[in-house]
């Protein structure tokens, strides 16, 4: 992608200084250096720049794109996709595992799959397939249309197609047809009852299936989807159910069909400690199954690899306290250690990462229709001796607020704000009185916020004041 075209002449020195201030303000307010992951950047004139390959020389200003498509008659709202970001994300994930495998001398490989349900756009899936071909990167399907698309996709021979979700006879037949076509289509058991159905259809079709089973681990994830894992999870086989499935396969001389162990403890896992616990438990389950003679080849860690949406690098729901490389290192090291202890071969590692691959690649652009100001700068009130005492008290606080009494002024303002609404609800104040009181309160907050910038340390109770005073954009 070409570099941004210069849209204006180089400004004079004082103007350049102002632009630098704009850049620093934008970077601070929007936090792009923290969550942009190298794909997004603020230019020196304060514009948002996208770097699809993370190379500064190949960046493009988002405004420039919007202006150019507007010349073609395309107006907002619109979605701009950057396929290069998809390719970069696929490469980052696979190369992180490659580095970990090399560092820890892991005697097997990584074979990731992309869950089609995360983004079913054909252009997205095809770009991921193209970018992942050199890594043997496959697909995950959870419905018949997705499975049909996965089987028809131009995947490399070593690529996996994993099948999760509900499996009726039509779905099973479709998967078995894929196996007949020499595709590595793995049907993952979510319930023991699915096994008899799969084996019956496979016998009728004359195809030996490739099977996996989803373990219901004791370990749980973190974040909004933590309940997807743990003992109360909706899907997955308990330990007795896994042993029952093994017994059924042994009795039918089809134990060699069980090639994958799978688990999933939730999407957007925010805390690496939860991931480590799940990996350790799943590694032991894998090793014990191998010791029982189950020839599992793949350990599928499911999804959950997070995205640091807010750039805080914490375990909050909108963030993650680990990197992709740390994730890969922990997976490889933990599984290798357990397999060495149990004297079993290490499995091929599989993940079903979706959001971590696609989250950054598209940008929604929309027009701002209006701005709702919390405080209208030109709105002032005139307080007289005839005004209610609560109004006069708020006016006095406003006039006396300074850097030395910010906390006291704020506490007093909150008290009189409560009194204002109480008196209004009791019928002792007019609508005009209430309006005056509200305006005075917000002007007090604005003055406090302004004076906070002069302090070295901001008191904890004022940390959310910037959000409280923020304008609301109507899009």
List the predicted regions and their residue ranges:
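Low-complexity, highly charged intrinsically disordered N-terminal segments
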Residues: 37, 42-120
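A non-catalytic, amphipathic alpha-helix used as a structural packing/dimerization or gating element
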Residues: 84-92, 244, 281, 330
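Intrinsic disorder
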Residues: 77-80, 87, 189, 318, ...
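Active-site-proximal beta-alpha core segment in soluble small-molecule metabolic enzymes
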Residues: 104-300, 305-307, 322-326, 334
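A general structural signal for short secondary-structure junctions and capping/turn motifs
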Residues: 29-32, 38-41, 67-71, 152-154, ...
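N-terminal basic/disordered segments at the start of proteins
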Residues: 2, 8-54, 58
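Charge-rich, low-complexity N-terminal segments
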Residues: 3-6, 27, 34, 218, ...
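C-terminal active-site-proximal or functional interface alpha/beta core segments in diverse enzymes
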Residues: 258, 265-475
């Amino acid at each position: 992608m070409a570099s941004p075209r210069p849209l204006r002449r180089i400004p004079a020195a004082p103007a350049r200084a102002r632009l630098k201030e704009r850049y620093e303000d934008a970077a601070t307010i929007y936090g792009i250096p923290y969550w942009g992951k190298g794909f997004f950047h603020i230019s020196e004139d304060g514009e948002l720049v996208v770097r699809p390959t993370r190379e500064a020389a190949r960046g493009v200003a988002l405004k420039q794109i919007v202006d150019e498509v507007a010349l073609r008659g395309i107006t907002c709202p619109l979605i701009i996709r950057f396929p290069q970001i998809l390719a970069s994300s696929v490469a980052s994930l696979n190369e992180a595992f490659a580095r970990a495998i090399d560092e820890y001398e892991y005697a097997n490989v990584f074979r990731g799959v992309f869950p089609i349900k995360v983004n079913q756009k054909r252009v997205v899936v095809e770009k991921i397939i193209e970018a992942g071909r050199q890594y043997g990167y496959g697909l995950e399907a959870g419905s018949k249309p997705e499975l049909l698309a996965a089987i028809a996709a131009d995947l490399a021979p070593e690529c996996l197609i994993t099948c999760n979700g509900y499996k009726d006879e039509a779905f099973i037949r479709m998967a078995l047809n894929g196996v007949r076509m020499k595709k590595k289509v793995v049907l993952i058991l979510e319930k023991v009852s699915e096994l008899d159905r799969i084996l019956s259809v496979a016998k009728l079709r004359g195809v030996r299936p490739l099977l996996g089973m989803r373990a219901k681990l004791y370990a749980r994830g973190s974040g909004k989807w933590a309940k997807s894992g743990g003992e109360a999870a909706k899907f997955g086989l308990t330990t007795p159910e896994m042993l029952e499935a093994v017994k059924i396969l042994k009795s039918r001389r089809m134990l060699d069909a069980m090639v994958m162990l799978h688990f999933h403890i939730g999407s957007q896992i925010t805390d690496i400690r939860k991931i480590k616990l799940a990996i350790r438990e799943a590694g032991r389950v894998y090793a014990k199954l191998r010791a029982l003679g189950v020839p599992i080849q793949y350990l599928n860690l499911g999804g959950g690899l997070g995205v640091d949406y807010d750039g805080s690098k914490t375990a909050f729901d909108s963030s993650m306290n680990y990197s992709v490389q740390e994730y890969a290192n922990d997976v490889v090291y933990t599984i290798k250690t357990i397999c060495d202890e149990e004297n079993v071969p290490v499995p091929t590692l599989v993940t079903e990462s979706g959001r971590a691959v696609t989250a950054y690649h598209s940008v929604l652009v929309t027009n701002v229709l209006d701005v709702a100001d919390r405080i209208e700068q030109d709105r002032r009130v005139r307080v007289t001796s005839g005004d209610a005492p609560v109004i006069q008290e708020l006016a006095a606080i406003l006039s006396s607020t300074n850097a030395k009494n910010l906390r006291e002024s704020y506490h007093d303002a909150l008290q009189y704000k409560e009194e204002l609404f109480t008196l209004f609800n009791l019928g002792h104040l007019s609508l005009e009185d209430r309006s005056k009181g509200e305006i005075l309160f917000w002007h007090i907050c604005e003055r406090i916020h302004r004076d906070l910038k002069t302090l070295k340390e901001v008191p904890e109770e004022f940390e959310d004041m910037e959000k409280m005073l923020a304008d609301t954009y109507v899009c």
